[in-house]
Amino acid sequence: MNTEILGVALQILLLLVISYPLGKHIAKVYKEGNDCMRFMAPIERFIYKLAGINPNEEMDWKAFLKSLLIINVFWFFWGMILLVSQGYLPLNPDGNSGQSPDLAFNTCISFMVNCNLQHYSGESGLTYFTQLFVIMLFQFITAATGMAAMAGIMKSMAAKTTKTIGNFWHYLVISCTRILFPMSLIVGFILIIQGTPMGFDSKMTIPTLEGAEQTVSQGPTAAIVPIKQLGTNGGGYFGVNSSHPLENPTYLTNIVECWSILIIPMALVFALGFYLKRKKLGYVIYGVMLFAYLLGVFCNVHYEMAGNPKIDEMGIDQSCGAMEGKETRLGPGATALWSVTTTVTSNGSLNRMHDSTMPLSGMVEMLNMQINTWFGGVGVGFMNYYAFLIIAVFISGLMVGRTPEFLGKKVEAREMKIATIVSLAHPFVILIFTAISSYVWVYAPEFVESEGGWLNNPGFHGFSEMLYEYTSSSANNGSGFEGLGDNTYFWNYTCGLALIISRYLPIVGQVAIAGLLANKKYTPESAGTLKTDTVTFGVMTFFVIVIVAALSFFPAQTLGPIAEYFSIY
């Protein structure tokens, strides 16, 4: 037990130590171009020339958003064509067939929006070709898209008055060449050294301990797993994700992969402070997010290491904690840390079965995604916080009788309306779709049966499975309570719709707020200006987030994990 807790503490310490210098590097990448990766400039110039891009052309927020949306639409059709026809494409030694149109739609939307919700198993649902030229490609592009959007927001916040927020294509390219690609190489080498496969051979046939034969999938796993983690993508190469011994073979790879999930989202908060030359603001935002993260880690580690009271009643020893759905090589401590890390971001990768977590652990995982603000996905994590920041500024200003201002710009009704829509759209999408699925389950049992029955666990936990699926989709997370049979027409299409709304509506709103504020007249700070870089304002923002986001889900949580908790304790 003590060793497991020490491992958890070590991983958190690694994140805290490395996120600060990495944040400084990221700020230099986006602001000055005078970073340690500037030797990549010739490759970047080649990409610009090949694509016909002028990286020095400034864009206003509307042109910026137009470019962002255009590239996503293009890659959607690219992915759909390849996924449906993958059975006829090269690099398919195992002879896997193409995906059905509804599954391809869900897969393509999911990876295009950085969610990586998987209604298929990677070994049989994809080929090496689509793993590389759809999945891995999307994992770089979608992560870079979020980072580019944040870079545009940072530029708008740093300028006193401007109509432009940078060049989307430039930010997209340098996010890949100077941040994501180099870090992926380092993580990939570590995985290869530890035994993760990297090749294009077909399935291996191996003898088991019982003397029978078993086939084991392999492939270019070590190339895909690093960006899966670093880009907060989360889509597993294998069906069981990082629970698989070839995707996550040792405790060291577990540390590296878990660290990779959160390091860039953490560093981007510091990067904001460095970019704006307001380090104190970065520290306050980082502190709020870190507090919420550590609170979740404490709860999950406690409940998972305490064991299941129902198993205690059977007289079974639980000195190792609640081990159902967990890998013995990792234990409940490391898997509890991972579950919180993967849900405070939009990663969604797994090293255990979330469906087997204790009820309140599952509630913490859902709350992290329902709040969707603590660090979050690369780039979009701060952007979600940004909407609540605007609301907190407005409320605080009214409470103390001051004009609401943020970084010298007046926050007025227009910005508040957009921020309110963005913050309320998330719970609206989750709760409406969960209500629809619950209605269909109760009042259309014939339809549900025609799709395989959906739920393996009716009752409180069955409701939690449906709530979790839409929560994960809307938070661009992609993890799941896998007791839900989700590869059906209903779940593929409804989750796909939730994915589209929840990805693009917030990005459009947040970039619009940044563009509108950037265009306003700058007002120098004075004694009457509301300070946004203080602990007091950080606490205010935290409670605004809890009241607006977390409490919206309390009735639904009561019907699911909270009711399940009282049924077993």
Q: Where do the model's predicted regions map?
A:
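N-terminal alpha-helical transmembrane segments of multi-pass membrane transport
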Residues: M1-N106, T161-G166, H170, I174-P207, ...
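Juxtamembrane/interface segments at transmembrane-helix termini
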Residues: L22-N34, L82-P93, A159-T162, I190-M204, ...
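A conserved hydrophobic secondary-structure block that centers on an alpha-helix together
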Residues: L126-F200, I255-G282
